[in-house]
Amino acid sequence: MKKLFPSIAKSNLFRQMAMAFSLLTFSRLVWFVANVFWLPPIGINEYVYAHLVGIYFDIPVVIGLFLPVWIWVIFGHSWRDKFPAINRILFVISSMTVLISNGIDTGYSQVTAKRSGYELFDILGDDANRFAPYIIDNWYIILGLAAMGYFIYRWVPIRGHYPDINFRMRPLRGLIATLTFAAICLIGFRGGFQLRPLRSIDASNFVQPEIAPLVTSTPLQIISTWKRNGLPNFEFDVQFPANSTITSDPKNSTSQKWLFDNSTTLLPLPMSRTLGGGWVQPNIVFIVVESLARDYTGFGNGKPFTPYLDKIAADPQTIQFPYCFANGTKSIEMVPSIFCGMPSLMSEFYVTSAYANNKVNNAFHLAKGYKTAFFHGSNNGTMGFQSFLKQTGLQQYHGIDQYPSELYKRDFDGNWGIFDEPYLQHFIRCMDTMNDGKQPVFASVFTLSSHHPYTIPEPYLNKLRGKPGTVQHTIAYADIALQKFFQTAATKPWFNNTVFVITGDHTSHSDKEYFYSQSGHYEVPFLIYAPGIDIKHINEKRNRSEELRNQQLRIQQPQTFANPPRNEWADIINTATQKTLSQCDIIPTLWNLLGANNPRLGFGRSAFDPNYEGYSTHIDKDLYYIIQYPFVLALNQQGKVVDYHKQLRNNNKSQKLPLEGPQFEWLRATLQCQMKEYSLRIKQNRWE
């Protein structure tokens, strides 16, 4: 092997690799100097650490973009010495690809405040005229790139030792070396052995999200987002109804609020009144059950596979919103919808798209004063949740890596992760640890047992409703897991100070035709359960002894509603629960109920907002849908209506409706506005 691979330190392979890494490090330094004004202040230790981590993130770039160089250097035994210029040219081309992409983005990041990915080509393609002023304004970058190109061409190491792989002389050794080279390239290009290939968004796992762009590079961002479908440019004009209250004008870049509203800043939720008459700042726990469709519940008028959940829904301390719709059909679409207020209006998944690094607000980040955590009993890298949530401000992510190793073998389902019952008990133990009396907790747990292939622990086989191996059977198991979760949690001191939100990430199979319709196929439960909080009268008489209580609690109690008497408060709840909501509305509704004044999150609004009529949107087969039960309207990418119908839950047949009337005009204008605004804001990374 000494003859095959000479001293690495003396080989040109090592020198060229070192030069490639040096170029990326240098371009990172230049990018930092040019963009330091919008980055948060960091100390020298953080800066050095970011560069060291950046070298790790440069590995896929060095392997991928310089692959022709390495193939020539390692396998070009017969031609390498005869044609040294080929090595030089290949290295210069690869190097300039890196430098040009980083160089262009050095100036462009000053505008977007982020690293650009493949969408940069879409932007330049949409309007090539933008590029000329950019070159003029950033002439020094162009000049620097030209100088770097000349330097690389002159100084790239060509003469010297190279690995000597000769298939004719030693075919077996050559085969082994080839397979080794391929394995190293594959592992390096993926960035290691983790579940998903290394992407720019993963930088937030190493440094604070605000300086993650310093760690990564534009070439890596382009590689991460290569061949993404992106977002279309909607050229149609919004057809506003007469006397419209919709304030959206996507053509006007200075439009103020539109349908989207990110005006909610860091939010200290006020104290809530307990059933015992005291006041607490409650814990918030989200329980998102995999594939939990409303169809599977008793309150959904279906076969009751969820007797315990039905019991919670009927509890006096529960508010049920019966017209809630998921914004997507995949688990990966749930996180941005619920926790960022971002519906699924892309043909690809937002979490893994070119725009995942956009600076959208996140409920975990906005909940000021809370410890925040997200729990999912699957691999830490699954669906990109950990990287996405960490870069939007989540404090703790708990996946299978954080599950007790001594329990793993017993509780692993053989497919996705930890069975629901033991994982929810693990979640309780973590809640015990987090509830140290210093800060309330805002945590979410996402179950997984009711995911295909629908496995449950052996003791429960043939003992639950539903056919084994079906989603209904595993939903029945998830209901048992919820029952045991609440039985254990009820013994904990933090239980009565906690508000629970229960919903599903999306729906699944059904034996009813309605639940395959464009409305029924998206219906998920939405329950707010507060066992120890006076949830239905939480704002009643909030001003009583307000000044004294504020002195005691040292917290301002913003008034959400006009402190109505009980009969009026019941009317408010009844009005809110009759509205059509989407997953985007869950957080604002919860916060509004807990006392926050007019909270907004992305495209989500509160059901208690008297000015919000309520609706849900999603995309299916390149058609865009808006639901305001029982009405459903669909548009194509040209903004043309392709379907408008009405369908009730107790009727499997939909009723086609004429394309006219105030309801039709409002739905069409609202969906057209959201399509245009969603696309424009994501492309421009505009979230003000």
Where are these regions (language model features)?
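Soluble catalytic regions of membrane-associated enzymes that act on cell-envelope
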Residues: Q194-R554, F561-G602, P610-S616, D620-D622
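Residues that form generic nucleotide/phosphate-binding pockets
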Residues: G54, G103, Y134, S204, ...
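Residue-level recognition of alpha-helix termini/interfacial anchor residues
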Residues: N138-I142, Y460, E660-F664
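Transmembrane and membrane-interface helices of multi-pass
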Residues: K2-E235
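Phosphate/adenylate-binding glycine loop and adjacent helical scaffold
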Residues: N598-E688
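Exposed alpha-helical structural elements
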Residues: Y47, E119, R130, T218-Q221, ...
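Bacterial/eukaryotic Sec-type N-terminal signal peptides
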Residues: M1-S7, N543, E547, Q557
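Intrinsic-disorder-associated interaction segments
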Residues: P6, S248, N252, E546, ...
